[in-house]
């Protein structure tokens, strides 16, 4: 059962690599990996810089998605358990 779900997810991933949702999903995975790395290696400043860059990219993509399609934006942030963007 799990293997079949993984295969279907892989097929979806191949089709939708350029979509905003997939990009946000992959950035979120990278952010979580870097965060766990930085908990162990606090003085790794290059990784901190990379984390800030990825956070900025994800923030810009989420802002774009919230302007274009608010429903998909809400659904995505609920799936990924991330907070909403701050409005100015």
Curated annotation (Swiss-Prot):
GO terms for molecular function: structural constituent of ribosome. GO terms for biological process: translation. The keyword Chloroplast applies. One of its GO terms (cellular component) is ribonucleoprotein complex. Pfam families: Ribosomal_S15. Part of the 30S ribosomal subunit. PANTHER family: RIBOSOMAL PROTEIN S15, BACTERIAL AND ORGANELLAR, SMALL RIBOSOMAL SUBUNIT PROTEIN US15M. This is Small ribosomal subunit protein uS15c. The lineage of its organism: Eukaryota, Viridiplantae, Streptophyta, Embryophyta, Tracheophyta.
